[in-house]
Amino acid sequence: PQVESCVVVRRIEKRTAMKAGRDFWWDDVLAPEAPQCEPERMGANDPLFILYTSGSTAKPKGILHGTGGYLLYATLTSKYVFDLKEHDIFWCTADAGWITGHSYLVYGPLSNGTTSLMFEGVPNFPKPDRFWEIVEKFGVNILYTAPTAVRSMMKDGDRWVNEHDISTLRLLGSVGEPITSKAWMWYYSTVGHGMCPIVDTWWQTETGGIMITSIPGAVDMKPGSAALPFFGIEPRVIGADGAEADAGERGSLVLTRPWPGMMLGVYGNAKAHKDVYFPTPGYYLTGDGAY
């Protein structure tokens, strides 16, 4: 596929250079359309989207996800990891252009009938209480954000949190990188007032959804630990020799069974799909270390 047209949202009062025949205003495109339309029926393995990721190195790879498996996995992980209810206000602070935004800002919450809050901006502008102002204003029940944001808000101090009534929060989530024990404890005690479970989640663009996590009310929490595999996920740690590592021994994190949300492949590069992710038969190589 290739991009042939660009639909532009009139977001700010600024002159935009538009190319006739290629660029179209969002409101002009929508104006003649009905507010509702019948959904298009798709096959389970029809492509749903391509997201480009490079990890920490290497050339960006177009990760291709399918319709049926991805949607199923985004729906189930949203439901059980976040204990979603239809009346919840769910706030995933990720950008919609990344996999976290795809799975837990758009597809996951909406497929469960939950209200999803979309945010544009940064946590500390115009003031360091921006997040807590939004939580209070909209009655957010579940907050899913990155450790980087947690550390930044922790640095700003407790008073910015305490100035707002954020008692509607009932569950907190962490995504994107390991969260330190210090940041975890601040998140739990200051933001959650010691009452909100924290789900520390590990997953990747390629996996489509959460793979390792605690389940609120079912799995004990441990600061700095993503806890246990999600239902049906079987991870292992292997050493440089390809053998399974002993308890406490560092190695490479691999997955030994397929799951619904796994990517269909690397778009246009079947060789990279095999060489990068399946160099050892029977294992999906995550590229992450573990012990």
Segments from the language model and where they lie:
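Gly/Ser/Thr-rich phosphate-binding loop
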Residues: 27, 111-114, 141-145, 154-221, ...
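Short beta-strand->loop structural element characteristic of the AMP-binding/adenylate-forming
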Residues: 1, 62-64, 115-123, 199
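Short Gly/Pro-enriched turn/cap motifs at secondary-structure boundaries
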Residues: 39-42, 220-229, 244, 280-282
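Active-site glycine-centered loops adjacent to acidic/histidine catalytic or metal-binding residues
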Residues: 95, 176, 203, 227, ...
